Amino acid sequence: MLSVSQVIALALAPGLLKRERMNNNPLPRLDTSPEVHQQLLPFCRLRPGGVWQDSRCGHRIACLDAADPIAIHSLVADSYATLAIHDPPYNLAAFQTRSITEYISWCQRWLTSTYKLLAADASLYVCLGADQNDGFQPLADFMLMMRQMPFKARSFITMRNQRGYGTQKNWMAVRQELLYYVKGNPPFNVAGEYTEIPKILRGYYKEVGGKLTQNIERSGSDTIRAGNVWVDIQQVFYRLEENVSGCYAQKPLKSTERIISASSQEGDVVLDLFAHSGTTLLAAERLRRVCLTADVDPVFCEISIRRLEHYRRTGRFGWQNGHAFEAELPQRFSSESDDAPPPEALRQASLF
């Protein structure tokens, strides 16, 4: 744990609090900004039912409803995935009017399709929210529903956010829930789950070959394994290069790459029925997997395509506080100042 003086020193390090010139033209949250969303539609290559095929690596992006099994066939064709990573919308504007019963029924439909599209031995990861002001829904009923599905539960992972929403009468909410299930008996690459956090706790002595050794000597790595509580994943916010403005609750590239590294091999097919900001697509590209992804919204399909093209062209993971449609729509959607102080900078200085 860093001392207060160390945190201050890190916060004042060159580049951390430096107000470097940053493109400050973000898109507003698209699920609650219908006017902006409508402006972006003419620039989208896909319409409902359309499929974009990547000629270089074989990735495919389809504009379809994840709960429509017939439409999904146009995305996967004869492919079978060894890994599925789903981040279904659970707190976006479009779902605020759905009852929990309707939401779970919708989840059952795309999960049934997912099971059929997975290989005999495959892994499934689902990101889901747990609203502590609403009986921990939809996570609570989702987990009960999964007990009736043919998947086998393997782990309940918590990702710790650096920021959260708090109250004077409750614990601050800083967790994200990630459920891990399997079909059959898929391999698990332990090397893929090692973090960059160095091992500092010594002890746990054990005699091996007549020699008394402690745990660090016996380990094959000088860093710790992730376990099922991840504290080393930086929550995406506007000053990160990977930020894709307009995409609410964007998942970090690092956590997605960790999942792909642990639960698939190079050349495998990775399935994602909720493309959103294109994080799974980009992670698969970087780790030499083939991604089959979809989104019901043509705008998010286009953002995913452009993010892949942007990465190949520039090596950058996102647009920071700019956006994917600036060539077509250069006008500012935000009145924030380029000189606004970065409130996250001090939070970034702490490891946890």
Please provide the spans of the model-predicted regions.
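Short functional hotspots where side chains directly engage DNA or cofactors
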Residues: 303, 307
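Core catalytic lobe of class I
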Residues: 1-32, 38-294, 298-302, 351-352
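S-adenosyl-L-methionine
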Residues: 50-73, 311-340
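C-terminal cap/substrate-recognition subdomain and adjoining C-terminal extension
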Residues: 341-342, 346, 352
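Conserved hydrophobic residues forming the short capping helix/wall of the S-adenosyl-L-methionine
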Residues: 146, 308, 312
